[in-house]
């Protein structure tokens, strides 16, 4: 297992399209383990493969992260949101936008169909933080980012702040 580098906005690779996972093998299991180690080290509640530069239709979530609950790591491979119901606003952060937290509108409940790390299909109905995390991570798989849910003004402000931070990070190296 290894901790991978998380791409930060405005890295263009975060917008690239992903491909379906077609091989369920030891390499995929290793990737999922690396993603989990990376997510927990960050720390975060979710991580999509494109956030570490892997353009596959895959994300992981553990909404118990940081709470007094046992870990409940979930792997979603080739996920498809079948149903999205209701409306909720919630403050979200993103590992690709360190330090940024914005109020985002999402569906209150979702039903998703995906595969696990062994290729078995499953369906899951989710609400609360899990539903929000599923939608957030699924967005990464289609090149949609947290800022895309913001007003044009907020998007520009966040963009400027992240570009400035990226320049400062580069100057330090």
Whereabouts are the PLM-identified features?
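Positively charged
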Residues: 1-173
């Amino acid at each position: 297992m290894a901790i991978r580098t998380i791409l930060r906005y405005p890295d263009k690779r975060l917008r690239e399209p992903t491909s379906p996972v077609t091989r369920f093998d030891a390499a995929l299991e290793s990737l999922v383990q690396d993603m989990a180690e990376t997510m927990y080290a960050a720390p975060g509640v979710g991580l999509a493969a494109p956030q570490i530069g892997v353009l596959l239709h895959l994300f992981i979530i553990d909404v118990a992260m940081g709470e007094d609950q046992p870990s409940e790591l979930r792997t979603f491979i080739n996920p498809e949101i079948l149903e999205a119901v209701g409306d909720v606003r919630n403050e979200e952060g993103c590992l690709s936008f360190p330090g940024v937290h914005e109020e985002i509108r999402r569906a209150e409940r979702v039903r998703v169909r995906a595969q696990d790390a062994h290729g078995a299909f499953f369906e899951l109905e989710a609400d609360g933080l899990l539903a929000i995390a599923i939608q957030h991570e699924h967005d990464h798989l289609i090149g949609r980012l947290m800022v895309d849910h913001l007003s044009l003004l907020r998007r520009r402000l966040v963009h400027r702040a992240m570009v400035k931070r990226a320049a400062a990070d580069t100057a330090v190296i």
